[in-house]
From Swiss-Prot:
Transmembrane segments: none annotated. It catalyses: L-homoserine + succinyl-CoA = O-succinyl-L-homoserine + CoA. The active site is at C142 (acyl-thioester intermediate), H235 (proton acceptor), E237. SUPFAM superfamilies: Class I glutamine amidotransferase-like. Pathway: Amino-acid biosynthesis; L-methionine biosynthesis via de novo pathway; O-succinyl-L-homoserine from L-homoserine: step 1/1. Substrate binds at K163, S192, R249. This is Homoserine O-succinyltransferase.
Amino acid sequence: MPVRIPDHLPAAEVLESENIFVMSETRAANQDIRPMKVLILNLMPNKIETETQLLRLLGNTPLQVDVDLLRIHDKESKHTSIDHMNTFYRDFEAVRHKNYDGLIITGAPLGQIDFEDVVYWDHIREIIDWSQEHVTSVLFLCWAAHAGLYHLYGLNRKILQQKRSGVFVHRRTSQHFPLLRGFDDEFFAPHSRFAEMDVEEIRQHPQLQLLAESDEAGAYLVLSRNNRNLFVMGHPEYQKSTLNEEYQRDLSQGLDPNVPQNYYRNDDPKADAIARWHSHGSLLVSNWLNYYVYQLTPYDLSDMTAMTPWESR
């Protein structure tokens, strides 16, 4: 099934060239199917690139998805035109009264800044709090995962001396969660961050479940026991070139970054990168959307109390 996007969104041309099924709002209006309504809070600098990455994953699922793009209303984007933002993005006040099947909150280049010092932290907290009553399931990515664990569950992160960048092997910690259906025993996922969460604190928290971890990269998948919040510590949405682009950017800024691990062939930054995580990323988002959104969300979104708990399925 397709992902439904606004008419003329730039990502459409890229996705269609990759044989990803997308549908314009005009075309979708002629179908009598209840789509999944997903809101994306895009905090990444390059909005169009991140839109494309996330829509690529949503477009590979068997469900029709109706996407709204959300911005922090008083924060200008330095890397995306005002025209694009005004055309395709909504302010929170425009969606506050609505309910959604799913919410995706992206990462942000804020890894070394205390949460309380982030300029728009109050807005992030407000949106997270709102989501707990207005969204069936929330997918937090990278920085947003740390922010969500801090705000909702009081967990603190540890700032790393060096940026953790690369593609790392992960393992499931359980066989029994619908989110992990189809996962290999070990799988790859990319990371790009300056902080990490304490694995033992996650394990000991009564409201959280650790579903996947890595010896090198630490906690990766964490699910709240009420199934509402999924925290992904890495970037399964990244395209093949993203880690290289970040590495080259850091080099150009004189930051002396470490070479992304397990990413370039033979760990040589002059060689080609190897994408080992795309199938995992597609399966992760597909399972989330199917098992934690579609199968739990009420048909009538105006009644969020009608969510179906897993125990009754």
